[in-house]
């Protein structure tokens, strides 16, 4: 509960900086499944009703997740006011991160490369995304998929 209270105090800019720091620390040739969701409004629940629904699927996925070759990360995008703001100073996730227009969104990264994404993910979507890793690895190893080296090194 203390962690949730600390998140509430962070602005969207602070949260975006945390995401940027995490993204820059991804090691080469590693897989990360990032979940972007609304910050808690009051208490433990997000202001975003779709995020609350998706959290059940994400929770089930986390239980089955152990032993997979992908790291699960969760990122908050700020308050409802910050997310829905139409002002010049838009939410940094919308302004600086391509195509993050909805929450919740799940994005599969190979190092810093955005490989696959799903809006309002369900457990089957998350399992599918992680299953794609084997296919991507096979394509990379066979030379059929040429990932820009700047993303994986």
Question: What residue spans do the PLM features occupy?
Answer:
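Short loop/turn segments at strand-loop or loop-helix junctions that form parts
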Residues: 34-40, 77, 109-111
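A short acidic, often aromatic-flanked loop/helix-cap motif at beta-alpha or helix-coil junctions
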Residues: 15-17, 78-84, 124-127
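Short, internal strand/loop/helix patches
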Residues: 89-97
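Thiol-based oxidoreductase modules, predominantly thioredoxin-like and allied folds used
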Residues: 9-10, 37, 62-89
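Local sequence-structure signature of Cys/Sec-based thiol-disulfide redox active-site neighborhoods
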Residues: 5-67
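N-terminal organelle transit peptides
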Residues: 1-8, 153
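Short coil/turn segments at secondary-structure boundaries
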Residues: 47, 88, 119-122
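Non-catalytic, surface beta->alpha helical segment in thiol-disulfide oxidoreductase systems
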Residues: 96-152
């Amino acid at each position: 509960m203390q962690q949730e209270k600390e998140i509430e105090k962070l602005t969207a800019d602070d949260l975006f900086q945390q995401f940027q720091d995490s993204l820059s620390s991804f090691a080469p040739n590693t897989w990360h499944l990032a979940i972007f969701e609304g910050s808690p409004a009051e208490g433990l629940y997000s202001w975003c009703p779709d995020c609350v629904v998706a959290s059940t699927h994400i929770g089930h996925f986390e239980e089955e997740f152990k032993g997979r070759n992908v790291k699960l990360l969760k990122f908050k995008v700020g308050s409802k006011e910050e997310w829905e703001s139409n002002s010049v100073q838009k939410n940094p996730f919308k302004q600086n991160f391509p195509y993050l227009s909805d929450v919740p969104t799940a994005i599969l990264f190979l190092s810093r490369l955005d490989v696959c994404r799903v809006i309002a993910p369900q457990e089957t979507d998350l399992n599918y995304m992680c299953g794609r890793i084997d296919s991507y690895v096979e394509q990379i190893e066979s030379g059929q998929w040429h990932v820009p080296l700047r993303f994986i090194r």
